[in-house]
Amino acid sequence: MHPHDQTIFALSSGRPPSAIAIVRLSGVGAGPALQTLTGKLPPPRLATRALLRDDRGDPIDDAVVLWFPGPASATGEDVAELHVHGSRAVITTLVSLLSAMPQMRAADRGEFTRRAFENGKIDLTEAEGLDDLIHADTDRQRRQALRQLKGLLGDKARSWRDQIIQAAALIEAGIDFADEGDVPAELIAPALAWIRQLLAEIEEVLAAQGRAERLRDGLTVVIAGPPNAGKSTLMNQLARREVAIVSPHAGTTRDLIEVALDLDGYPVTVIDTAGIRQTDDPVEQEGVRRARDRAAQADLVLWLTEDDQAELERQTDGPIWFVRNKIDLMITEQSGAISVSPESPVFAISARSGAGMSDLLEALVGFARDYFGATEHGLITRERQRTWLSETAAALRRSIAAVDLGEELAAEELRIAALALGRLLGRVDVEDLLDVIFREFCIGK
């Protein structure tokens, strides 16, 4: 971990060339750097046009600069932004000048956000929400990440923690009274009622069955089947572009091909696999092995043709939909859903002409809707969050059971519950975890 007496900088926009590039700075050297480049500090929080100059006084670029004195800034430190033209030459010159300034260095991944966290601008759940927002592929993922970034889980966790501490204070006050006789019931009874109410609220959040986590991770659909069944053609139809090579020769697909889709706002990853068959070709054998492995891990398998159904069913516990392809070559075949069995529906399509695809797509959207559920009520988006909420709930249960054994035990369990929520928020004993979380961010964020 780098010391905070160093000022960090990074290109926060996309790769050049581009219309505009944004270079961010954070730390005690942000103001002096801005002064060196522009000749003076601009008014705080006001976009100001300025000519940037190098150390010889030669112009670099005509820019828009912003100055945010800390602590009223995104990171809690002095922050500057340089909005320049996004040419490689401008950015290279600017980065070279900044690198040569004293106590100035390039930022690590997620370091701006980490400084915001360490300066109390955001908690860890909000930082995770920001990471999810950056990586959101669909509108539903965006809305969920934004709820997290706005502190939906963090605010609840802080409220729960404060109430647990107050309940513990009531019990500990009762312990103090016990030195003079029995523990007053008027202290213990409301504390217990408070704890039970908190436990019910946390258990309700935990009972959401990981819906928000599912939305963050997405749904995986594997297209499997024998060689030359039209799997790659179906993949291209679903993606509405050519992502897989289509050939009349069997065994064209040797490796897994993945494409991310947005189905009515739901994130779906579709995977095209090698044709499953017996073969002596070692390369194709590896492709078949990977196909079987991915089918076993999939949330849904689309099996083209009905050959080897039993063999596939033994390899996956998940749902299988059978898709009869190439109906354009079968005069009497009817397109669309030809079986409505909820366990293994059968669809008749032509991946080449698109016949029957609307029914298959409609069914996929319905499957995704059921799979993700009512995600707008989900608060937990990561296993880490679920772990600490589960620890909190377990400690609250133990505190209720411990009251009859001794108020000291109940108070200790409440301290454990408050500690777990502190870890959820990133305020207690999480130093080792921070490197892992912020490493997922991009440079400049």
From Swiss-Prot:
Cofactor binding description: Binds 1 potassium ion per subunit.
Positions with a binding annotation for (6S)-5-formyl-5,6,7,8-tetrahydrofolate: 24, 81, 121, 445
Keywords, ordered alphabetically: Cytoplasm, GTP-binding, Hydrolase, Magnesium, Metal-binding, Nucleotide-binding, Potassium, tRNA processing
Binding-site residues, GTP: 228-233, 247-253, 272-275, 350-352
Pfam families: MMR_HSR1, MnmE_helical, TrmE_N
Enzyme class: hydrolase
TrmE-type G domain location: 218-369
UniProt-listed InterPro entries: G_TrmE, GTP-bd, GTP-bd_TrmE_N, GTPase_MnmE, MnmE_dom2, MnmE_helical, P-loop_NTPase, Small_GTP-bd
Residues that hold Mg(2+) according to the record: 232, 253
Subcellular location: Cytoplasm
rRNA-binding is among the record's keywords: no
Co-factor requirement: K(+)
Any single biological process term in GO: tRNA wobble uridine modification
Main location: cytoplasm
KW Cytoplasm (keyword) present: yes
GO cellular component term of the entry, any: cytoplasm
GO terms, molecular function: GTP binding; GTPase activity; metal ion binding
Family annotation (PROSITE patterns): G_TRME
Protein name: tRNA modification GTPase MnmE
Primary gene name: mnmE
